[in-house]
Amino acid sequence: MHLVAIRRAIYEKNPWIASSLYSASVESKRIARARLRYAGSLAAMLPWLQDEIEEIDEVFGGDPFAYGIEPNRPTLEALVRYMHEQHFIPEALPIEKLFVPLPGAAGT
């Protein structure tokens, strides 16, 4: 899992930046997953890659790297809890306070 952060000052001057980064990430993931599935030649030197992709689709419902708060809530809450317990952050904020709203984004 990766998390992209935008400095508040940059976001406040350029509020479009969050949705642009999200859209670029969604498109990048779509292209990468399509390339993995292309059977003309393998994207990686794993002869069982197609079987692995099918199993991943079965187990994760088609997307092992879902975007948005809701599909990642347990992981995000654990991250905030651990950071607070280990004194990296002064208080454990609600997850919604950590992300800007992205209208139309999946899982938000």
Q: Could you say what each language-model-derived stretch is?
A:
Residues 2:
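Glycine/small-residue-rich pyrophosphate-binding loop that anchors the diphosphate of NDP-sugar donors
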Residues 68-108:
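Long, low-complexity C-terminal extensions of enzymes
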